Regions:
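N-terminal secretory signal peptides that target proteins for export/translocation
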Residues: 1-10
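Bacterial N-terminal signal peptides
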Residues: 12-25
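Sec/Tat signal peptide C-region and signal peptidase I cleavage site
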Residues: 27-31
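Primarily the internal scaffold of c-type cytochrome electron-transfer domains
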Residues: 33-36, 57-96, 125-133, 141-388
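Residues immediately within or flanking Cys/His clusters that coordinate Zn2+
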Residues: 41-50, 103, 107, 132, ...
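Cys/His/Pro-rich metal-binding microdomains
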Residues: 46-54, 111, 136, 178, ...
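Post-signal peptide N-terminal segment of secreted/secretory-pathway proteins
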Residues: 96-136, 387, 402
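A cross-kingdom marker for long, charged
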Residues: 375-449
Length: 449
């Protein structure tokens, strides 16, 4: 597959450095019902579109919110096209290849992530699935809060009690994004889907939110309503969420009992989908030649976060990650051992995440993470394209976080190198591990890592 849409958008992101999304610091990431699983009715995006609500053409300055949120979503957010894309030739071909009884724009497996796919009994009279990934797909069915959220005494806490999804909580937001961009038990993304022709899927939550683009502004009023924010937390919680979803899917017995092979979607795509003529296996890799490896790109990032923000847990997490890889690549590997290793790591990461959520991502913490991400090139951690792609987005996000903290020197040094790194990621099939790592090693000296 040639450069995907994300790669093509990276240049746009580089021009907007310093404007990425900032979300409120989480409490402990309390469990929250996903919008598509809510018991409440979805009333339809049209109810948000009035110019006196969120459909203003221009931003309003005299109100607590911009009031042009719907307009920004409609004009600029790719999520508006999520349903429409199901009608194009590629989507219809995927549905045919999968042997679906319905066309893509009617099949549940497609609609689950390409629309706000709720049961008919939960659809209000003005609900329209063709709106794609609409307001209620992210903010939750509005049946109980659409009237009360504009009342003078309304509060964010009360709105959440009424069914508003807490997108201002970094981990809750990240779990929502990754439920489709990684997959979860309710919306699994399988190797069958990919094999039928679906483009490769990847995500780094903070980067994707910056590209979305944001339809709100973090200002004094926002903070007053939703609480203080921490610039680096959305990136960190995004990595924890991606890792959690991956581990949950690995441990899902319903997904790993379909023949002699496990669900291949959890593995690094390029371990198999690499040209036969490409002979770049390195003895430094933590696997033998010919072995498929679980896609650990987010786990690599999480370990860097833990080393900086919760170092007391670093050794234990590192051992558990290694145990997962050993279980999945052992000649005597079996599903039960892999699932056990995934469950143990998942439980421990959930505990550590709650610790990390309480740690302020200061300039010192972010700088330590950045240098660690750069240093990992020397240890061959970015041997696979997925790891390199995640490193690129993460280094950019953390550098932007440093800029917001006032450390413009390191941020400018990093940003001056990003174009060259991006070029090395423009074609996943032609990824040059040594060239990418060489660029990062040059950056290592520049930032004093």
């Amino acid at each position: 597959m040639k450069a995907n849409a994300l790669n093509r958008c990276f240049n746009c992101l580089l021009l907007a450095l310093g404007t990425s999304v900032l979300l409120a610091a989480p409490t402990a990431g309390m469990a929250q019902t996903m919008p598509h699983q809510s018991p409440h009715q979805s009333v339809g995006t049209v109810n948000c579109a009035s110019s006196t609500c969120h459909g203003s053409i221009a931003e309003r300055t005299a109100t607590p919110v911009l009031q042009n949120e719907y307009t920004t979503w409609l004009r600029e957010d790719p999520h508006t096209q999520a349903y429409a894309v199901l009608k194009n030739a590629q989507s219809q071909r995927i549905a045919k290849n999968m042997g679906l009884a319905q066309p893509a724009h009617e099949a549940k497996v497609c609609l689950d992530c390409h629309s706000h796919n709720v049961p008919a009994s939960k659809q209000g009279p003005r609900f329209d699935k063709s709106d794609g990934v609409n307001c209620e797909a992210c903010h939750g069915p509005a049946e109980k809060w659409i009237k009360t959220h504009v009342e003078p005494k309304a509060s964010n806490t009360k709105n959440i009690e009424n069914g508003l999804y807490p997108t201002s909580d970094p981990y809750a937001a990240a779990k929502l994004c990754t439920s489709c961009h990684v997959g979860d038990s309710s919306r699994p993304i399988t190797h069958q889907i990919m094999g039928a022709g679906h483009p490769r899927i990847s995500i780094e939550v903070e980067t994707f939110m910056a590209l979305e683009p944001p339809h709100y502004r973090i200002d004094e009023d926002w903070v007053k309503r939703k609480g203080a924010y921490d610039a680096g937390k959305i990136w960190a919680m995004g990595q924890f969420a991606s890792s959690a979803n991956l581990l949950e899917l690995i441990a899902d017995t319903k997904r790993n009992r379909q023949g002699i092979m496990p669900e291949l979607m959890m593995f690094d795509c390029h371990a198999c989908h690499s040209p036969m003529s490409k002979k770049d296996w390195s003895k430094d890799l933590a696997r033998s030649p010919g072995q498929a490896r679980i896609n650990n790109s987010s786990l690599i990032m999480v370990q860097a976060i833990i080393r900086a923000a919760a170092p007391q847990h670093s050794s234990d997490i590192g051992k558990l990650v290694n145990q997962l890889h050993i279980a999945s690549t052992s000649p005597a590997a079996n599903f039960n051992e892999v699932e056990r290793a995934a469950n143990v790591l998942h439980a421990q990461l959930n505990t550590v995440r709650k610790v990390v959520a309480t740690v302020p991502f200061t300039e010192q913490v972010l700088e330590k993470i950045l240098k660690d991400l750069v240093n990992m090139a020397a240890n061959n951690q970015y041997a696979d394209f997925a790891g390199a792609e995640q490193a690129y987005m993460s280094i950019s996000s953390v550098a932007n976080g440093l800029a917001r903290k006032g450390n413009s020197r390191i941020a400018q040094t990093v940003n001056s190198k990003m174009d060259r790194l991006l070029k090395l990621l423009s074609n996943d099939e032609a990824y040059d591990r040594e060239a990418f790592q060489s660029e990062l090693l040059a950056l290592k000296a520049a930032v004093g890592a």
